[in-house]
Swiss-Prot record:
Part of a SCF E3 ubiquitin ligase complex. Interacts with skp1. The keyword Mitochondrion applies. Keywords: Leucine-rich repeat, Mitochondrion, Repeat, Ubl conjugation pathway. Its main location: mitochondrion. It holds the Pfam family F-box-like. Involved in substrate recognition in ubiquitin-dependent degradation. It comes from Schizosaccharomyces pombe (strain 972 / ATCC 24843). This is SCF E3 ubiquitin ligase complex F-box protein pof2. One of its GO terms (biological process) is SCF-dependent proteasomal ubiquitin-dependent protein catabolic process.
Amino acid sequence: MRVPNEVCFNILSYLEADELRCKSTVCTSWRNFIIPTLWEKVVFQNEAQLNNFFDTLQYSKDVSYYFRYLRKLNCSRVRKFLTDKHLMLMTLATGISRLNLSGCTRISEPLIGKLLYQNLNLVTINFSNIFSLPANILEYISDNCPNLKALNIGNCGLVEDTGMVQIIKRCPYLNRLIIPNCRKLTDVSLQILSEKEDLIELDISGCEGFHNADTLSRLVSRNRGLKELSMDGCTELSHFITFLNLNCELDAMRALSLNNLPDLKDSDIELITCKFSKLNSLFLSKCIGLTDSSLLSLTKLSQSLTTLHLGHCYEITDIGVQCLLKSCKNITYIDFGGCLRLSDIAVSAIAKLPYLQRVGLVKCICLTDLSVILLSGSFSRNLERVHLSYCIGLTAKSVSYLMYNCKTLKHLSVTGINSILCTELRSFSRPIPDGINPSQVPVFCAFTKVEIDLFREFIRNRI
């Protein structure tokens, strides 16, 4: 009995890439199904993969045949190695819809332009962290990518208003725009952007040229479907919420990042909880003007809030944390790093969160071993990541207890705690990672799941 091709193809779709490559030589019909499947998405994991790919294909007679099926190209993981030599080969593709060249700083403008010209169906482009990306690349995009929906040019410091305005005007389907630290952009771009009505995600963090809070308010009001807004460090836009219409409720907003806005007030948080009543994630790190009153306001988000970052909000106390966490029981990630007034009392409330997966308490210098014991308790069944670095009141005894008893723990950092550095516990620390601040090297101490498992085995053998 001959199995229909449709059934064969359905079975083949469950196979891994290596198995598919072997099966592609079985017959022509299988090959015709497998080749497009293998080539739909190309992601390079390391330099060896990139060079092997290039060396294999550069002299292949079928190279154009293969590239016609390429739809998603991701070179971000080989950003240090990708050059024009490699990118020239990629320009044979004509059907790419998703392009990620994040951090690929060794490629030139002409080849980027050619790749854009060859692929008119691009819907997602990521050129972030190409620090010297020429400003006129935006003109290439606006001229050649009419179907663009998502653009990420974060940290591309040469981008200017002229190109950004063209993108906004000529790409009518654009609904995700990520432009952090594009410091040459001004209110001209913000004004044009405020005329759109279908934005889903917007990141303008670090865009120091944006000054008009009223314009941002109009943008938010018009884009009722906006789900994510990040504006870290945009100090002159801090009070945009006060310009919103009193009757304007924006229930679509799920994630709001307002880090490093020292002028943000408790009254602003009160308005935020009223306007964005279904927020899941709220980031308020270094908003030093906030007090326990803000935490009281956040209790209005009790049903929706799952992620909250309040690091370095120095006026927050145990009372505020207790009040907040009595209501907000669905939190999975909470960070109070640098909140110097917090004590074991606050951690006792944190430890009772039934779905807690990640907690940050770095530099909470008033904590004692009791806090760590509490985190190790019966509610820790989901706890995966704990950050306790520079909590100088802790000892190796409590940290060892946490590592042994919290079975779901995958990461624990206790850097800078002298009472731990001088014990055998430190010998289980993971290797010091590349790029770490030199001042942290002598006091580094952290554990991943591998080291935690080794420690548990060590303890079991000693019992």
